[in-house]
């Protein structure tokens, strides 16, 4: 959803179990072809490539250091990367030179959201986004409203709140 390499195949999976199913169902004809895997930091690629090799794939490669390393070293003009890269911290996404991206997290489902998502009638700040709208219980909506109040109190008093947007360098 956030970014990818030009020409890559998106398995549209949310976890490793789904990825295994995708491989077994969709990549049978790729066992003798060159395969390049990429992920944010390279860790999940280790697991995926190991699984693929066990399943008989002959030429499985990984992007060393992951997309993060690639974006930090390859200038945008020479890059095959399209979009932003999801990261697992409060930055949410980064672009080339590891500059802050434009995505934020939906407070309800924790999925990345962009300007288009936020312009949807299904987006309610701190409550829902197009991905989770209509899936949130009344109890959770009440809790999310309370969290929003606490965030605003923290913000107005200049206090730390884990839901405010900080980068690691802001904290040290």
Protein language model features and the residues they cover:
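Rhodanese-like catalytic fold shared by cysteine-dependent sulfurtransferases
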Residues: 1-35, 43-172
């Amino acid at each position: 959803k956030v970014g990818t390499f030009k020409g890559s195949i998106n398995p549209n999976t949310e976890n490793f179990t789904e990825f295994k199913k995708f491989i077994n169902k969709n990549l049978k004809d790729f066992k003798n072809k060159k395969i390049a895997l990429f992920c944010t930091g390279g860790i999940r690629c280790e697991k995926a490539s190991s699984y693929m090799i066990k399943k008989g794939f002959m030429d499985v490669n990984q992007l060393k250091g992951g997309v993060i390393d690639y974006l930090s070293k390859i200038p945008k003009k020479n890059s095959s990367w399209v979009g932003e890269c999801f990261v697992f911290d409060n930055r949410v996404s980064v672009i080339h030179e590891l500059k802050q991206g434009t995505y934020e997290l939906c407070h309800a489902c924790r999925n990345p959201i962009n300007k288009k998502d936020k312009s949807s009638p299904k987006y309610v700040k701190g409550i829902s986004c197009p991905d989770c709208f209509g899936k949130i219980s009344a109890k959770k909506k009440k809790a999310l409203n309370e969290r929003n109040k606490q965030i605003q109190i923290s913000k107005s008093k200049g206090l730390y709140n884990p839901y405010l947007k900080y980068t690691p360098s802001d904290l040290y």
